[in-house]
């Protein structure tokens, strides 16, 4: 049967080949008969035949075939025979065994076709329904075979979906084009610097697995799945294959003999087997550390405060430009002068940005403070005062050689006689050098941010010491302030003991304007005392040291910074042991690491669970404090509501003003005692303890108006002389502790946050004691005292600057567990103590002079140079009291302070 079928197929192929040959031979004759007559037509036919023969020869030469040239119709016959052979006598490409490859087409006959069809491994021609799939699979597989094989001969013929009918020129063009593009097209080679397995390998493996599942009865052999042949110039590959071939995915040593295994097509992903993916290898779970917690807290604080500043619309450069425009509109300047002024402004802005970038980009000196100051353009000269938080230095702006030669920076005159420095060019400044470690241990991040923000806001104020520059290094913060050559007002009191009533009236009037300016900027000073009023070169007063100032902003609340750290520690499960006292308390009372009370109010659920969307708006609405509660300040000048821990407002500053006026007229504070505890008890019972001495001659010189204004200021806040605007706060203060977050009525035209109101000294100014004071022109009047120095570097008014003080700061039970000193800019020191802890350092009334002869009492002289014994300091944050973590946390928290002061 097989022989009969082979002979029948041979006869069928021969018949079809002869038919095609006859058609090819008769085409020129037909065209010659139909086209032209005579020898001219015959010549044209011969030319046409030669052109066709040359085209076919070039085509076949590109296909790698050698063309016989005998006879006129040999080329056409050979071409059509090759086409018939390709369409009828082709077997599919097999990926499961090695085939014998055909040689060149020269000498091919119909007997070869018959032998191929009689081959035992020959597969019948697939049906027309699967011809498209077979063609697509063959083309894909053949491309992969060519890219994988390094050197290979001509590839076995591919089964094409061509009909057995007579071919037309269009079909012939499609056939040749497809043959050239699929079999002998140009190869694309992708070169990678680091060759690796592609992501498509897994998909190819899944397809292979799907094929294996569909043919369970496949026979396996040890032969190679890729046909091998001799090298051919057409199929030679210069580099390793970059694509994945189907045969390369099969396991080594096992191949499939099913001829259709390489042609199965997966139409959709639904045919893929549903198998669970292998788990991805990951690094082992890492336990969170304190470094992670602190870094996260620092980033959160920075992002929230930074974007709050951006969204608030407070652009300093825009404000300066608006001020420039206002200046140009105010003065009648010519167009040339306007251009010159604008160019000068642009130059200043450019220089500022350049210096800012230099300070940001250059590495800071970790050990030398002089190196950092020099980098910022300042040269340290001498020390003005010392404090527990740092030191105040007199610095001079560095001059360049060009400025010195051109005379742009005139030098201050150096003389041997003292003179007033009014109108003389100032080239020196006072620079605060604050130690970060001390600030962090005392939890002063929020206070430092509040001080800097207020100084920036008060840059154009007449009554506030202006901030010139601020920068930092790894260990210190630097605030460059304007230099007040006259020293502080406390030094003036020490030198003169008691002031005459007219002089005291003038200075207290300027103090009122200073405090009122701070309230106009929505800030409660909370540390009003003689130390914080500085005397300028003209003799007028300016207020300074806003380290304890309160403005209600959530970013100026120390609890906000503490909560960021402790909440993360609680979520991550990091245990904080603290020191021995903390461990004892935790063991006895089972106290959590995070306290249940906060600095300025109770810890509510809203604080513990802030929203994820609209966080900044939520903080502005819910965490902006409308009343202050912290027990801060200097004990002798603290108001009774502050000592009691009740909610208070800006009226506490006017109480301190009454104490200062009393001290100016009598030489000592009204509630001075041997220790702070007794001082606070006297303030608490001020109605019984306040008295006005009359046994000295100077006491009789105090007028009744002065006594009345002092008595009106030293009252409970509901009856204190200030402004009627605060009356609405009295109802709020009678509510529970949550009133510090009371939502006020913003419809009030004078609303500023309820804790402070602008122009809140109307009742004080209208008192008869200040009759004759021109409040609008007082800054133009001649002051009672004008400092006389030999030059800007003369610091005679600061040599006596070690004044005793008992300043307190944030004695909340949730944060304060020990005694802390607080720094002030002129060398005074103060401690921070609990209200019920007795301490020494208050000044007795008997220590002050008993007469008006101007002699200095020996007790005051000894107090100026006395060094108070420092008690052992205990960090206020439990994390900083832990011996295992405090060093690491302290180093990381320095970055937080840097962000706050930059």
Swiss-Prot record:
Chain intervals with Low complexity compositional bias: 222-239
Keyword Iron set for record: no
Coiled coil residues, start to end: none
Residues covered by region (Disordered): 1-22, 97-154, 207-288, 797-875
Keywords from the named record: ATP-binding, Kinase, Nucleotide-binding, Serine/threonine-protein kinase, Transferase
Binding residue positions for ATP: 384-392, 432
Biased composition (Polar residues): 125-134, 240-259
Gene3D superfamilies: Phosphorylase Kinase, domain 1, Transferase(Phosphotransferase) domain 1
Transmembrane intervals: none
Function text: Protein kinase that seems to play a role in the regulation of cell morphogenesis and proliferation.
UniProt name for this protein: Serine/threonine-protein kinase cbk1
Species this protein is from: Emericella nidulans (strain FGSC A4 / ATCC 38163 / CBS 112.46 / NRRL 194 / M139) (Aspergillus nidulans)
Lineage, broadest ranks: Eukaryota, Fungi, Dikarya, Ascomycota, Pezizomycotina
């Amino acid at each position: 049967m097989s022989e009969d079928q082979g002979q029948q197929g041979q006869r069928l192929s021969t018949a079809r080949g002869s038919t095609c040959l006859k058609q090819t031979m008769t085409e020129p004759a037909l065209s010659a008969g139909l086209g032209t007559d005579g020898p001219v037509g015959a010549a044209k036919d011969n030319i046409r035949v030669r052109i066709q023969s040359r085209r076919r020869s070039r085509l076949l030469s590109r296909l790698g075939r050698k063309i016989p040239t005998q006879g006129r119709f040999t080329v056409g016959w050979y071409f059509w025979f090759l086409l018939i052979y390709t369409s009828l006598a082709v077997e599919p490409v097999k990926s499961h065994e090695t085939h014998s490859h055909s040689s060149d087409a020269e000498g091919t006959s119909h007997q070869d076709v018959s032998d191929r069809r009689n081959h035992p491994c020959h597969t019948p021609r697939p049906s027309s329904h699967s011809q498209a799939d077979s063609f697509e699979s063959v083309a894909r597989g053949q491309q992969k075979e060519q890219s994988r094989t390094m050197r290979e001969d001509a590839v076995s013929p591919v089964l094409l979906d061509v009909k057995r009918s007579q071919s037309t020129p269009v079909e012939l063009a499609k056939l040749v084009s497809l043959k050239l593009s699929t079999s002998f097209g140009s190869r694309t080679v992708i070169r990678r610097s680091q060759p690796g397995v592609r992501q498509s390998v897994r998909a190819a493996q899944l397809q292979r697995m799907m094929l294996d599942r569909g043919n369970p009865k496949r026979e396996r052999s040890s032969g190679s799945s890729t046909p091998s042949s001799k090298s051919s110039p057409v199929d030679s590959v210069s580099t390793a294959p970059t694509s994945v071939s189907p045969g390369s995915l099969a396991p080594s040593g096992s191949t499939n003999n099913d001829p259709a295994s390489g042609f199965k097509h997966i139409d959709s992903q639904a045919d893929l087997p549903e198998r669970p993916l292998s788990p991805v290898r990951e690094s082992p779970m890492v336990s969170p550390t304190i470094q992670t917690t602190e870094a996260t807290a620092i980033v959160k604080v920075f992002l929230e405060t930074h974007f709050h500043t951006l969204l608030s619309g407070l652009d300093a450069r825009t404000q300066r430009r608006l001020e420039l425009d206002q200046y140009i509109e105010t003065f009648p300047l010519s167009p040339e002068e306007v251009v010159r002024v604008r160019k000068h402004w642009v130059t200043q802005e450019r220089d500022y940005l350049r210096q800012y970038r230099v300070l940001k980009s250059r590495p800071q000196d970790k050990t030398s403070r002089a190196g950092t100051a020099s980098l910022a353009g300042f040269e340290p000269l001498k020390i003005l005062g010392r404090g527990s938080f740092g030191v105040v230095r007199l610095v001079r702006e560095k001059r360049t050689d060009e400025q010195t030669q051109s005379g742009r920076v005139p030098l201050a005159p150096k003389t041997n006689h003292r003179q007033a420095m009014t109108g003389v060019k100032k080239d020196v400044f006072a620079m605060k050098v604050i130690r970060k470690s001390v600030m962090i241990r005392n939890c002063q991040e929020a206070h430092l941010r509040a001080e800097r923000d207020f100084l920036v806001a008060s840059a154009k104020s007449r009554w506030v010491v202006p901030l010139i520059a601020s920068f930092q290094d790894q260990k210190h913060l630097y605030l460059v302030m304007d230099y007040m050559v006259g020293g502080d007002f406390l030094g003036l009191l020490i030198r003169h003991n008691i002031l005459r009533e007219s002089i005291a009236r003038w200075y207290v009037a300027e103090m009122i304007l200073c405090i009122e300016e701070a309230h106009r900027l929505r800030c409660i000073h909370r540390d009003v005392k003689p130390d914080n009023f500085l005397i300028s070169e003209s003799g007028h007063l300016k207020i300074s040291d806003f380290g304890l100032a309160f403005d209600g902003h959530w970013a100026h609340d120390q609890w906000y910074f503490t909560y960021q750290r402790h909440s993360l520690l609680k979520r991550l499960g990091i245990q904080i042991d603290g020191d021995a006292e903390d461990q004892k308390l935790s063991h006895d009372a089972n106290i959590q690491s995070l306290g249940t009370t906060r600095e300025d109010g109770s810890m509510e659920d809203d604080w513990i669970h802030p929203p994820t969307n609209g966080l900044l708006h939520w903080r502005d609405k819910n965490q902006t404090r409308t009343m202050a509660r912290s027990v801060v300040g200097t004990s002798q000048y603290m108001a009774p509501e502050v000592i009691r821990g009740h909610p208070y407002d800006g009226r506490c500053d006017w109480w301190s003003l009454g104490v200062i006026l009393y001290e100016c007229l009598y030489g000592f504070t009204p509630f001075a005692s041997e220790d702070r505890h007794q001082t606070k008890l006297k303030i608490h019972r001020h109605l019984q303890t306040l008295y006005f001495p009359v046994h000295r001659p100077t006491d009789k010189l105090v007028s009744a108006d002065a006594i009345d204004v002092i008595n009106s200021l030293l009252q409970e806040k509901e009856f204190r002389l200030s402004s009627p605007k605060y009356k609405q706060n009295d109802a709020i203060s009678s509510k529970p502790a949550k009133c510090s977050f009371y939502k006020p009525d913003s419809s009030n035209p004078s609303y500023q946050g309820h804790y402070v109101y602008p122009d809140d000294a109307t009742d004080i100014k209208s008192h008869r004691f200040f009759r004759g004071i021109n409040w609008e022109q007082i800054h133009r009047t001649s002051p009672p005292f004008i400092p006389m120095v030999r030059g800007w570097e003369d610091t005679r008014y600061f040599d006596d600057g070690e004044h005793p003080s008992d300043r307190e700061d944030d004695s909340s039970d949730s944060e304060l567990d020990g005694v802390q000193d607080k720094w002030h800019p002129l060398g005074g020191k103060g401690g921070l103590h609990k209200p019920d802890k007795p301490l020494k350092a208050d000044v007795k009334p008997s220590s002050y002079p008993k007469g008006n002869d101007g002699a200095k009492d020996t007790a005051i002289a000894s107090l100026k140079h006395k060094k108070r014994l420092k008690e052992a300091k205990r960090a206020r944050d439990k994390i900083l009291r832990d011996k295992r973590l405090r060093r690491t946390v302290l180093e990381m928290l320095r970055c937080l302070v840097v962000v706050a002061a930059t």
